[in-house]
């Protein structure tokens, strides 16, 4: 394995009270155009460069239609109706340059599975 001299992984919460939108964040991170059905705003980041990979990973029990980014994040926006709701968590990570693109992707996927599994257990008080 490669030595990692520095690990920086900030986690932030996307919440309406801070003027943020899960749909807007998803559009920005994926470099796509999405319309937020909650407030009617169109978020177009199709000209944004630097998107190496965008993927939605769903648990086995999730409805298959949530593989569509617009359906997934608009569903979150619709379910969480109050202005003070936390809509999503955003995790940024500096990946080791020594790893290939495939290795970086595998690392991120493993982290996502591990993180969501841990969060599910915290939520259920297990």
How would you name each of these model-derived features?
Residues 1-125:
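N-terminal nicking endonuclease/strand-transfer module with a His-rich metal-binding environment
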């Amino acid at each position: 394995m490669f030595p990692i001299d520095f690990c920086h992984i900030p986690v932030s919460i996307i919440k309406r009270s801070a003027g943020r939108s899960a749909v807007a964040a998803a559009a920005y991170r994926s470099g796509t155009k999405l319309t937020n059905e909650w407030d009617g705003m169109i978020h177009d980041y199709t000209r944004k460069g630097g998107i190496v990979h965008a993927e939605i990973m769903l648990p086995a029990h999730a409805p298959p239609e949530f593989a569509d980014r617009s359906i997934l994040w608009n569903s979150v926006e619709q379910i969480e109706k109050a202005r003070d709701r936390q809509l999503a968590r955003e995790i940024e990570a500096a990946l080791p340059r020594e790893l290939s693109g495939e290795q970086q992707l595998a690392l991120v996927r493993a982290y996502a599975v591990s993180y969501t599994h841990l969060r599910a257990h915290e939520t259920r008080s297990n």
